[in-house]
């Protein structure tokens, strides 16, 4: 990932409809045409003087200067007709993908303006349709129309344009409420609040505040010089089955009938379900007849495992594990895999078990064994000695391998470094150490081992971030505790804008985020730029759970805001 260069960045904004451009007719909201005309009346979206001086077309707008030497110019392409996102299907998403393909050479990035109700589905589907992306595709929308006095649409759309225009993040993303998510990791979690989306099992790719923080190691790398491939042959006959206590086997049998070709089955907890013989038999028969069933947990966070007998029974019935995929991503992936021609049933199941577009987090053992054992490669490299060439190879490769082991939670590989007396404070190009990576990923066992072996608890990467700050942002409470016990403290620079961050978390009702900052030693009474503190923001927003939490932290009482 790199910051986009050049004096002008040209984007295509594809307006499909959605609440952001809706108008009231007869007391209800309906899709509204002419979004470009609305945006031209808002100075934050258009610099008319620059447009006239450069003779820009009527449908092309230009943002005010994002930096002294760069302009973002964007063309608004309005779909005919506009859609309520509840009516969107694979057919419409194929049209969006093909529109991106037709204009791919003309623009450096794309923004898709979409209704929020099915935006997570759209982002997941597009991520599989668009292979070998070299440019950002950012979906966004709003909970309230953009022309309303109090709307989230302005910040969301402006943020999406800036992220697509200023950064080269070659993925299908979703930007909402100051956060850039990987699209196929998102789900809509609130029907009314502005913080409508979350990414349950992957931190945001970027967070916007006083500064823009990019989680560089999470951003997927572009596939070299490969050309964009658009997969428009998606299988529509896939479905979603949510298990519930006492679900009859007869109902499951009826649901699994043709023309259905694939099913995402939402199970309990870590992939568990009823073990009644008649129900398991229906699932087994369907799988033997060629129906592909993917097991996803209906929990918001966590993953499917085989820790319990009922989970093992599901795997024994021929069901494919969806690991930590969202149901939206699993449906999209199933549609994509079933749409690929010439594959056997076994080949399709293998594809479903692979991480194709960053949609799932595979267990560490699966990651390491996909292309061979990482530990064996490290041991071979560490055993090389005697030549200048070997030493050069070690200097180049060892930091990356150490960070890869920390990322995967691979204690055995890291132990190989220790046994051969290698430095575990190796840094990569961005100043990251294995402790940074393990802290961000939440690998408590790896953090423990690294601390015991002398890892620098106060190491800073090139952005001035400590392992403790990364653990806080990942909300990894066990790791925060380990680092604090080892003497880690947040620096004054890391706490400089903490008041604003705490107020943002309080406004969103994010108790887990607030608890992480408190555990790391932050003063939860720190005010934001307006002089308000998190408790006051939570009270004003009516977030009773957050108010109770903040009041339980005895050192988090704040004074009244100072008058302006």
Curated annotation (Swiss-Prot):
InterPro entries given in the database record: Ankyrin_rpt, Ankyrin_rpt-contain_sf, AsnA_fam, Asp/glu_Ase-like_sf, Asparaginase/glutaminase-like, Asparaginase/glutaminase_AS2, Asparaginase_C, L-asparaginase_C
GO molecular function annotations of the record: 1-alkyl-2-acetylglycerophosphocholine esterase activity; acyltransferase activity, transferring groups other than amino-acyl groups; asparaginase activity; lysophospholipase activity
Annotated Pfam families: Ank_2 (PF12796), Asparaginase (PF00710), Asparaginase_C (PF17763)
SUPFAM superfamilies membership: Ankyrin repeat, Glutaminase/Asparaginase
Occurrences of domain Asparaginase/glutaminase (ranges): 9-355
Coiled-coil region: none
Asparaginase: region residues: 41-350
UniProt family annotation: In the N-terminal section; belongs to the asparaginase 1 family.
Name this polypeptide is given: 60 kDa lysophospholipase
């Amino acid at each position: 990932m790199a910051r986009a260069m050049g004096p002008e960045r040209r984007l295509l904004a594809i307006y499909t409809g959605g609440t952001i451009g809706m108008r009231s007719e007869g007391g209800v909201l309906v899709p509204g045409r002419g979004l470009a005309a609305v945006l031209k009346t808002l100075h934050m979206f258009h610099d008319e003087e620059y447009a006239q001086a450069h003779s820009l077309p009527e449908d092309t707008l230009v943002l005010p200067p994002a930096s002294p030497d760069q302009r973002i110019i964007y063309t608004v392409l309005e779909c005919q007709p506009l859609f309520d996102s509840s009516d969107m299907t694979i057919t419409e998403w194929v049209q969006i993908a093909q529109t991106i393909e037709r204009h791919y050479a003309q623009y450096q990035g794309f923004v898709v303006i979409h209704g929020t109700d099915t935006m997570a589905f759209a982002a997941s589907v597009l991520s599989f349709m668009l292979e070998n992306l070299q440019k950002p595709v950012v979906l966004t929308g709003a909970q309230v129309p953009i022309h309303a006095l109090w709307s989230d649409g302005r910040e969301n759309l402006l943020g999406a344009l800036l992220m697509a225009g200023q950064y080269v993040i070659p993925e299908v993303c979703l930007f909402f409420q100051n956060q850039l998510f990987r699209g196929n990791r998102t789900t809509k979690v609130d029907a009314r609040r502005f913080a409508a989306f979350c990414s349950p099992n992957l931190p945001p790719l970027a967070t916007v505040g006083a500064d823009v923080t990019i989680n560089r190691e999470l951003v997927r790398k572009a596939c070299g010089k490969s050309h964009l491939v658009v997969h428009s042959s998606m299988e529509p006959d896939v479905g979603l089955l949510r298990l519930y206590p006492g679900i009859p086997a007869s109902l499951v049998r009826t649901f699994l009938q043709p023309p259905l070709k694939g099913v995402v089955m939402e199970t309990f907890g870590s992939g568990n379900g009823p073990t009644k013989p008649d129900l398991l038999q229906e699932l087994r028969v369907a799988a033997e007849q060629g129906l592909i069933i993917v097991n996803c947990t209906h929990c918001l966070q966590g993953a499917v495992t085989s820790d319990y007998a009922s989970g093992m029974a599901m795997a024994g019935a021929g069901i494919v594990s969806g690991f930590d995929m969202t149901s939206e991503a699993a449906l999209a992936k199933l549609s994509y895999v079933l749409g690929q021609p010439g594959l056997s049933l076994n080949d399709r199941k293998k594809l479903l078990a692979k991480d194709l577009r960053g949609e799932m987090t595979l267990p560490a053992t699966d990651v390491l064994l996909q292309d061979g054992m990482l530990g064996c490669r490290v041991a071979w490299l560490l055993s090389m000695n005697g030549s200048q060439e070997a030493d050069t190879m070690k200097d180049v490769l060892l930091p990356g391998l150490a960070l890869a082991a920390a990322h995967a939670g691979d204690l055995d590989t890291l132990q190989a470094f220790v046994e051969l007396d290698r430095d575990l404070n190796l840094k990569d190009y961005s100043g990251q150490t294995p402790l940074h990576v393990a802290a961000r990923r939440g690998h408590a066992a790896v953090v423990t081992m690294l601390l015991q072996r002398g890892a620098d608890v106060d190491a800073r990467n090139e952005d001035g971030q400590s392992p403790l700050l990364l653990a806080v942002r990942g909300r990894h409470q066990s790791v925060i505790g380990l680092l604090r016990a080892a003497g880690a403290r947040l620096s004054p620079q890391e706490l400089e804008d903490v008041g604003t961050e705490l107020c943002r978390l309080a406004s969103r009702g994010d108790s887990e985020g607030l608890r992480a900052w408190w555990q790391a030693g932050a003063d939860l009474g720190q005010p934001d730029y307006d002089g308000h503190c998190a408790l006051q923001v939570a009270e004003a927003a009516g977030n009773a759970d957050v108010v109770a939490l903040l009041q339980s932290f005895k050192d988090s009482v704040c004074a009244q805001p100072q008058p302006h």
